[in-house]
Amino acid sequence: GELDTLLRPFGLTFARYEALVLLSFSRAGALPLRLIGERLMVHPTSVTNTIDRLEHAGLVVRKPNPQDRRGTLAEITPAGRAVVVQATEVLMTAEFGLRGYQDDQLCAMFSLLRTLRVEAGDFTE
């Protein structure tokens, strides 16, 4: 799609971008792979593949989870943080692919998604 095309110069797909953004927003810049899957609502295999590619590109590193010896953390690197900033600027310029919608359509989508996120506990009203 349009977003993947915009992200291609950064070596990213939208799924990889989402994972990097999630890591960049986390307090420590690192999250367990399991939690990444839960937050992005994707299968563990997809998380593994995404982190593999981001790690290969030098945008994240894997580390043992000090809270769970069986688990692994993905941690964003300085290069990963730089790519998030640059890619976000490009996506913002393209209005995240939402240019074709009228204001009333955007408001309806925002309202619906806000309700879903409040119910999911992402934030309070």
List PLM regions with ranges.
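Generic leucine side-chain signal with a strong bias for well-ordered alpha-helical environments
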Residues: 20-23, 33, 40, 54, ...
